[in-house]
Structure formats: structure tokens, C-alpha cells
């Protein structure tokens, strides 16, 4: 993390919610944050988003969760204190923190403005800072202390409760489309899956001036996709006639389903010459990769994970300008365990946001 290299004063008392071990039992966890340094911003957390990633981290699915674990990589709040050299923010500003709270700042990726691909990142929930050895704890807590570089300005006309999930779902789909030039009017983009990521992807595509076609496993969400989210068309992925008619018509396809579930051949067949498949769903297994469609159509497959700081801010500003928010159920902290079970059972439309400011009690 950019900033001081002296020993930190970890004396800011904090409380968050998370897990003490991989059992998945959620509970209040008391811990300490650092005293704000000269370039730090102290934030009173008001809302924290919850998604499937948090549930998997709580249970240590990938084997790198550090306990005690306080989750939260979608955080919105207000500034309550700033360091002496902070230039971007003042007390009272609405702000946000995404998936990252630090990076090396020196590598090619960081220098290119893509801090999310830094080989030594400081993630918001559970990293150890390279220089100081400080643990990071997520935003599902009463307070955060973050280097100003990694604090985002929150647009005034964007509601924090409905917008906080954009810090994950929004940037995950915005970044690859922006990178590939699919943010231009007239582009035809297919969206596989209509969950938290897919529903937001459709909203961004329409705001870009593009055509959005949702591809799903059943017609259950057809009315919702078209009437609520503005999709131009809806296709069932087993309808061979519909798929045949769409072959070679799309500039891009964004796959928001868990990686490997959607046949790659199906997605590649929908693409125009020079089209791209964007993988943003975490892969659960290996998948077959047909080479002929790639070679004969100069098609490409890219993966993407969140976005750099510049992209984060651009995404929030764009969302505010076009009134893009996530379909969100706002809950109190006491409902968190139930919310996690509902996420596991796919029983949420489409995101949860915890009202931290009004429901997380902090006692010295």
C-alpha cells in the first residue's frame, strides 16, 4: 500500500460480522483498524453488499480465507476523518470502497491503471499488507480506514443502498465491455444468465445504446428480462431454431454463469467475425475449447475480474448518469445468516445490501 512504512498504530476499535472458522457460522467480530495516517480516509460504513463470493469465502471454498474473517468488498459510507495530506476528500463526503484497498503501485499493471491485476494486491477482505503486516478486514463493519487512492467518490444522485452492489456486479460486467469497445451504440451483446451480474449487464448495454439479448436455460425469466431490465430479446439455450437465427450476429457475449456450464461452442457460434466471449463467472471445472471457430472467425475469449480504480469511478459516474442500480433487498445485520442461506439456495432477486448504519451496533 502506498503510504507510511513506519509501525502502525492499530488502536481504532471496530466491530464487523464474519466467521471465526470454516464452519460458516456468522457472528460479530471485534478487531482493530489502524489510526488514520496522513493519506488515509476514515469512513463510517453505511451499507455493505453481500454476494455469493462472500458466502464462499466464509466457508473457505478456495483455501485462502484468513480467520477471523470479516467479509465485505462492496462498501458505501461517509467520510468522518481525513489525514493531513488527503486531497480528494473532506469530512461528510459520500464515498465507497470496492474489492481493493491497496496494491504495489510499481508493477506494469498498477502503472497502467489496472490495480486489480497487481500480483501483490491488498484485497478489502482478508489480505495482509506487504509493508506493515496489517490485516485487512472487510466492509461489513462499522468503520474502515483506507488510503485515499483506493477510496471512490460516490455520485450524489446514486442511492447507496441500491447502488452498493455495483462495486462488484457493476464493475465486473462494465470493465470487459469497456475494454473491448462494446460500450459504443449499435453493438449487439448476448448475456448468458439473468442473476445479479446478468441483470446489471443488460442495463449497461442498453445505456451504451446497444442491443441486449438474454440467453437462459428456461423461459421463466423472459418477461422480467424484457419488461423490467429492457432486454431486446430472450432466447432459451436449447431452442435450436432461435440459436440458428442468431448465429454470427453478436459483437460480444458475456457469460455470467459459473464458468464451464455454458458450452463454449454455443457462445462462439453466436459471434460475428472479431467477436469476443467475456468470462466473468468463476470457473468450477475445465471446459472444452473448440479451436476452429476461433481461427476461422478471428474470435477471442477473455476473462475479466473487477476493474482498475479509474474504471470503478467511471462505472459509478456512468451508472448515476443513467439511473442504473442493482435490484437489491436491503436487510438488517441480524438477517445476515438467513441472507447467506438464501444466496446459497438462489433465493434472492438479485442482491442483498446490509443497512450497517442503522442496524450494526457498536459498543466499546
UniProtKB/Swiss-Prot annotation:
Gene Ontology BP terms: indole alkaloid metabolic process; response to jasmonic acid; response to silver ion
Details of cofactor binding: Binds 2 Zn(2+) ions per subunit.
Keyword Zinc in annotation: yes
Resulting phenotype, residue 53 to T: Abolished activity
EC number(s) from the headed UniProt entry: 1.3.1.36
Example GO molecular function: oxidoreductase activity, acting on the CH-OH group of donors, NAD or NADP as acceptor
Keywords: Alkaloid metabolism, Metal-binding, NADP, Oxidoreductase, Zinc
Binding site for Zn(2+) 1: 51, 73-74, 168
Binding site residues for Zn(2+) 2: 104, 107, 110, 118
InterPro entries hit by this protein: ADH-like_C, ADH-like_N, ADH_Zn_CS, CAD-like, GroES-like_sf, NAD(P)-bd_dom_sf, PKS_ER
Phenotype of the disrupted gene, per the record: Accumulation of ajmalicine at the expense of catharanthine and vindoline production. Lower tabersonine-forming activity.
Pathway: Alkaloid biosynthesis
Reactions catalysed: (19E)-geissoschizine + NADP(+) = 4,21-dehydrogeissoschizine + NADPH
Pfam family, one: ADH_zinc_N
Keyword Cell division among UniProt keywords: no
Induction notes from the record: Induced by methyl jasmonate (MeJA, MJ) and silver nitrate (AgNO(3)).
Assembly description: Homodimer.
UniProt function note: Component of the seco-iridoid and derivatives monoterpenoid indole alkaloids (MIAs, e.g. catharanthine, tabersonine, vincadifformine, vindoline, vincristine, quinine and strychnine) biosynthesis pathway. During the conversion of strictosidine aglycone to geissoschizine, catalyzes iminium reduction on 4,21-dehydrogeissoschizine to produce 19E-geissoschizine, precursor of catharanthine and tabersonine derivatives. May also trigger the production of reactive intermediate used by the HL1, HL2, HL3 and HL4 to form catharanthine, vincadifformine and tabersonine.
The protein's name in its UniProt record: Geissoschizine synthase
Source species of the chain: Catharanthus roseus
Encoding gene per record: GS
Amino acid at each position: 500500500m502506498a503510504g507510511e512504512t513506519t509501525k502502525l498504530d492499530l488502536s481504532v476499535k471496530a466491530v464487523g460480522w464474519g466467521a471465526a472458522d470454516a464452519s460458516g457460522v456468522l457472528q460479530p467480530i471485534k478487531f482493530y483498524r489502524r489510526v488514520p495516517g496522513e493519506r488515509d480516509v476514515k469512513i463510517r460504513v453505511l451499507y455493505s453488499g453481500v454476494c455469493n463470493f462472500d458466502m464462499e469465502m466464509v466457508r473457505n471454498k478456495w483455501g485462502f480465507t484468513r480467520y477471523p474473517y470479516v467479509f465485505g468488498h462492496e462498501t458505501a459510507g461517509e467520510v468522518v476523518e481525513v489525514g493531513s495530506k488527503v486531497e480528494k476528500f473532506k469530512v461528510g463526503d459520500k464515498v465507497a470502497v470496492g474489492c481493493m484497498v491497496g496494491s504495489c503501485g510499481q508493477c506494469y499493471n498498477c502503472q497502467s491503471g489496472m490495480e486489480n491485476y497487481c500480483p501483490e494486491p491488498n484485497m478489502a477482505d482478508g489480505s495482509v499488507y506487504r509493508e506493515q503486516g496489517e490485516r485487512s478486514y472487510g466492509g461489513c463493519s462499522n468503520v474502515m480506514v483506507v488510503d485515499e487512492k483506493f477510496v471512490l467518490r460516490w455520485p450524489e444522485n446514486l442511492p447507496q443502498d441500491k447502488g452498493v452492489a455495483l462495486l462488484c456486479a457493476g464493475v465486473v460486467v462494465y470493465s470487459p465491455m469497456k475494454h473491448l469497445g462494446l460500450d459504443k451504440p449499435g453493438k449487439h451483446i448476448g448475456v448468458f444468465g439473468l442473476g445479479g451480474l446478468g441483470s446489471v449487464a443488460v442495463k449497461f448495454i442498453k445505456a451504451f445504446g446497444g442491443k441486449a439479448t438474454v440467453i437462459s436455460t428456461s423461459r421463466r425469466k423472459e418477461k422480467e428480462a424484457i419488461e423490467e431490465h429492457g432486454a431486446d430479446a430472450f432466447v432459451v439455450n436449447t431452442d435450436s431454431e432461435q440459436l440458428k437465427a442468431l448465429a454470427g450476429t453478436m459483437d460480444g457475449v458475456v457469460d455470467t454463469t459459473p464458468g464451464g456450464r455454458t458450452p463454449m461452442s454455443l457462445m462462439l457460434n453466436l459471434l460475428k467475425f472479431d467477436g469476443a466471449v467475456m468470462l466473468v463467472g468463476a470457473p468450477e471445472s475445465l471446459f472444452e475449447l473448440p479451436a476452429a471457430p476461433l481461427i476461422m472467425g478471428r474470435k477471442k475469449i477473455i476473462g475479466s475480474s473487477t476493474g482498475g480504480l479509474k474504471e470503478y469511478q467511471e462505472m459509478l459516474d456512468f451508472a448515476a448518469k443513467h439511473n442504473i442500480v442493482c435490484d437489491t433487498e436491503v436487510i438488517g445485520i441480524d438477517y445476515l445468516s438467513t441472507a447467506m442461506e438464501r444466496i446459497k439456495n438462489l433465493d434472492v432477486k438479485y442482491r442483498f445490501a446490509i443497512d450497517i448504519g442503522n442496524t450494526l451496533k457498536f459498543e466499546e
